[in-house]
Amino acid sequence: MNNIIEINDITVPELDVYARTSEVQLLRYYEPKPGLFIAESPKVIERALNAGYEPLSFLVEHKDLEGEAKQILERYPKIPVYTAEYDVLVGMTGYALARGMLCAMKRRRLPSVEEICQNTSRIAILENVVNPTNIGAIFRSAAALHMDAVLLTSGCSDPLYRRAARVSMGTVFQIPWTYF
């Protein structure tokens, strides 16, 4: 892999999306177009990639370059992979990485309610669920219950927030959803 970049300076601008940009700022990163989100853990990243989301960069704990992350990284030889030891990454991000890997990805335009509801028979409707952990758990349950789609009111937390996507184990990328 020739796209590995050792992190020696955690203040470089390329790492801002991982360390110094809030979830809300990521959401609005390219306004008025869809912004960014951070996927955490190889399983969640793999599901996002399989759903067609575009990676911008990866942040990987050095010891995990040869672990679960390796197969994902080999598929994207031109995408930058920033890496450092555990202590450096925790100091930069403020938390331990789940399974040692993060990925900055571009959001996509959300489908309309009409597009979501077309050819569906089982839809979960979420009203004002503000906790990202709860959003993730509900999406995971919706997947287990074979829901065709999820509709969220504008008062709901974003399913692509890092914690919501991680708790859902990536099912937010497998079940169609939108706000109404």
Regions inferred by a protein language model and the residue ranges of each:
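Boundary-proximal intrinsically disordered activation/regulatory segments immediately upstream
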Residues: M1-A69, C156-S157
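Short acidic-hydrophobic, aromatic-tinged amphipathic segments that line or gate anion-handling sites
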Residues: I4-T11, P80-E85, P176-F180
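Short active-site oxyanion
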Residues: K33-L36, E54-F58, K78-P80, D148-V150, ...
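Phosphate- and divalent-cation-binding pockets in alpha/beta enzyme and binding domains
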Residues: R47, E68, G91, N134, ...
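Short, conserved catalytic or adaptor-binding loops enriched in Gly and charged residues
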Residues: Q71-Y76, V167-T171
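A glycine-rich helix N-cap at a beta->alpha junction
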Residues: L73-G94, T178
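Glycine-rich phosphate-binding loops that contact phosphosugars or nucleotide phosphates
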Residues: C103
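RNA substrate-binding interface of SAM-dependent RNA methyltransferases
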Residues: R109-F180
